[in-house]
UniProtKB/Swiss-Prot annotation:
Record CDD domains: ABC_RecF
Family listed: Belongs to the RecF family.
List of residues binding ATP: 30-37
Protein name: DNA replication and repair protein RecF
GO biological process, one term: double-strand break repair
Length: 367
């Protein structure tokens, strides 16, 4: 799949933008704060209905305007699609696919699959578990509407259980069991799918990482569950999860929060059997992030039969020449949209037919 056409109205610093993209490589060049990343953000937003930069949709609307508009024409192997999203200042959004309104965000998933790699993605490797959980949840939601459903339901039950715990009172022990059973049902499905995804990430990521590092480093990914039970196989996750919740019930009532479940889980990233988050160098952490992103591309290809669109947001300048070469030689069958301040260092790796755009102060001109 690839983005054939992009139209923006009052999106960030763009009054209006109309561009046709090449199905292979597109490069947006410009100084900082000119609008390069805004182009990538609009494409990412059209893929899952949320930004990778902000949780406040109103920030996507140009200053002193009442709404913003995104229109994207997606060319696919089977059936082309047109996505239109209007973002309103009140925080609402209207989404149309082929001129038909969709009410559930999950209906948008899979129409335009995107993998983004930005400097902020280093947080997947080096920051707290919440960043790694977010990565898993986004990737799995793109691939499975059922996963997204389980995630939404789990979060809803978790919030209700935590509200009950915070409220306290004599009735809590009598009521809490209803929430425990629902948490175990939805949560076990989440854990099961996360573990499956990490196994794929492990298998594909190992090969990619060895190639990037010239066989010098071996990477591994291991799921870390807050449910401390070594006998938790695939068929018994729900049963054991429920046992753990019940076992921790009195402690949860005392502490007033839910202490076990996928909302507390993590995954370990090791390079040569050493924890990359704690002991990896900045270069190793960057390479691990690169591996994760490129493995994600292959996982999506394996699952749906075609590569997603790859968005590279000002990351090439952060990588050495060997990593730059790896990226630009690995994207021949993938539409890639790159932002950078200049192409001098990467020009030798680019195809002659790469489409170049100059971005300045919310204006985008094809070179």
């Amino acid at each position: 799949m690839y983005v054939k056409y992009l139209k923006l109205i009052n999106f960030r610093n763009y009054k209006e933008l109309n561009i046709e993209l090449d199905k292979n490589i597109n490069v947006f060049i410009g100084n900082n704060a000119q609008g390069k990343t805004n182009v990538l953000e609009s494409i990412y937003y059209a893929s899952i209905g949320r930004s990778h930069r902000t949780s406040k949709d109103k920030e996507l609307i140009k200053w002193q305007e009442s709404n913003s508009y995104i229109k994207i024409y997606v060319a696919k192997e089977r059936l082309d699609k047109t996505i239109e999203i209007r973002v309103l200042k009140e925080g609402k959004k209207a989404i149309n696919v082929n001129s038909i309104n969709i009410n559930k965000l999950s209906e948008l998933f899979g129409i335009l699959n995107v993998v983004i790699f930005s400097p902020e993605d280093l947080s997947i490797v080096k920051e707290s578990p919440s960043f790694r959980r977010k990565f898993l949840d986004i990737e799995l939601s793109k691939l499975s509407k059922q996963y997204y459903y389980n995630l939404v339901q789990y979060q809803k039950v978790l919030n209700e259980r935590n509200m009950l715990l915070k409220k306290g009172g004599d009735e809590v022990p009598n009521i809490i069991g209803v929430y425990d059973e629902q948490l175990a049902r939805f949560g076990s499905n989440i854990i099961r799918e996360r573990e499956k995804y990490l196994k794929k990430l492990n298998d594909i990521g190992k090969k990619i990482h060895l190639e990037i590092t010239s066989d010098k480093e071996e990477i591994s990914f291991t799921y870390l569950s807050s449910i401390k039970n070594k006998n938790m196989d695939d068929g018994k996750i729900e049963e054991i999860f429920l046992q753990e919740i019940i076992k921790n019930r009195n402690s949860d009532i005392e502490k007033r929060y839910t202490s076990v479940g996928p909302h507390r889980d993590d995954f370990l990233i090791n390079i040569n059997n050493v924890n990359t988050r704690s002991y990896g160098s900045q270069g190793q952490q960057r390479t691990a992030t690169l591996t994760i992103k490129f493995a994600s591309l292959d996982i999506i290809k394996d699952e749906i039969g075609e590569y997603p669109v790859l968005l590279l947001d000002d990351v090439l300048s952060e990588l050495d020449s060997s990593r730059q070469k790896y990226i630009l030689s690995s994207i021949r069958d993938i539409q890639t949209i790159i932002t950078c301040t200049g192409i001098e260092n990467i020009k030798k790796y680019l195809k002659n037919d790469a489409k170049i755009f100059k971005v300045e102060n919310g204006e985008c001109i094809e070179n």
